[in-house]
Amino acid sequence: MAMNPLTVPSLPRLSGIGDIETRVILKKLARAHQALAELKGVAASMPNQSILVSTLSLQEAKDSSEIENIITTHDDLYRSDSASHHFVTLAAKEVHNYAVALRVGFEKVKRTGLLTLNDILEIQAGIEENRAGFRKLPGTALKNDKTGETVYTPPQHEGDITALMADLERFINEPGDCDWDPLTKMAVIHHQFESIHPFYDGNGRTGRVVNILYLVQQGLLDTPVLYLSRYINQHKADYYRLLQTVRETGEWEAWLLFMLEGVEQTAGQTTALVVDIKAQMQQVKHRLRSELPKIYSQDLINNLFRHPYTKIEFVASELQVTRQTAARYLDEVVALGLLSKHKRGKENFYLNDALFARLANVNSRRDEA
């Protein structure tokens, strides 16, 4: 029976949903797992995976924030610096907040093996820079941006929200609850989180962080490098339509296929991106070692790929050299043609042009190259 969006829905406990892994879903799961396994293997072959966490988490943050109409350019994003609290625009600041929350959540999940309500609360607090916690007051309704029509009313009462989130926490962390594939569970977890809509703000971005961290918790990824938000952003209308279809009909197949297609597509795109970044690092390593042996170091190479826009203070800090030495290193790399130098105000930025161009075009896959 179709639900009236103006009435408060009674969301199901997750253990009571039933068997939703149809034959079509099982076939799609196999393809999605193959793509994820390839991405995991390629990422593990990187000599320093922290480079991927730093660089690709910003890319994911940008795409996830665009779903919420928080738009920033790659230029503003990479010229901003969350460590020094310098942000070119407010949008860049919000994107950096997301990336930091993702990295902090990743470190916690890797350390504990759990993804708890406290972790989710911390992620949302980092994204929104407030500690309002779960909703305590009624009145939240999701509306069509264009018409203003209410399309969905999530649970309104604090007790219901708390109970549903506790149920979600158990579902995430206790594998004995059901024998679904982890990717099926990820799609169901995401749907349930979006439907509970537990926060006043930041639900979408927090939910997409939970997606990535759940894949890490389940061992499907070692690092949070899957570009699922880009796929959702490209198919935003279908995303919201299918979320609502499950709420109204209880039919899961189309939603699961949508999310699994997203995993398969974005895993392939991200695999191609990681392969290209690794190849670029090897090329830079060869050039520096052969043409600038006096300044060559793996730490310098790591810096140039951790920060698409690097700065003198980044190099000085990470290589433990003086600012004067760091400036000389960067100018020599510029002279070699591996970086371009840009002055903004009183500050110089050094752009890794090849990396920047590749990050701005993550849609390509290796089989399309």
Regions found by a protein language model. Give the residues of each.
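FIC/Doc superfamily catalytic core
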Residues: M1-A369
